[in-house]
């Protein structure tokens, strides 16, 4: 699972869990077919749709030196009805 970095838990992503959509950050060089293959292989689910967008990096300053963080890619994966990813299906308390 080199391409999938981690799951994202924001207000929007928690709301999308009710629609059987899961959000995760992936490496920016990964393709949609790779991500779909990894999700189907490692989690044993069927993916029916994928949406992605690239989030920009942010500027970081250390004294007079201005740097930046790398941009990253976020995928919203829609699963077929009846499938779910158990570790990501937790309620917020």
Swiss-Prot record:
Keyword set, alphabetical order: Chloroplast, Plastid, Ribonucleoprotein, Ribosomal protein, RNA-binding, rRNA-binding
GO annotation, biological process: translation
Keyword ATP-binding: no
Primary subcellular site in the record, as a coarse category: plastid
GO molecular function: mRNA binding; rRNA binding; structural constituent of ribosome
UniProt superkingdom: Eukaryota
Coiled coil: none
Subcellular location: Plastid, Chloroplast
Subunit structure: Part of the 50S ribosomal subunit.
Family statement drawn from the similarity comment of this UniProt entry: Belongs to the universal ribosomal protein uL23 family.
UniProt name for this protein: Large ribosomal subunit protein uL23c
Species annotation: Prunus persica (Peach)
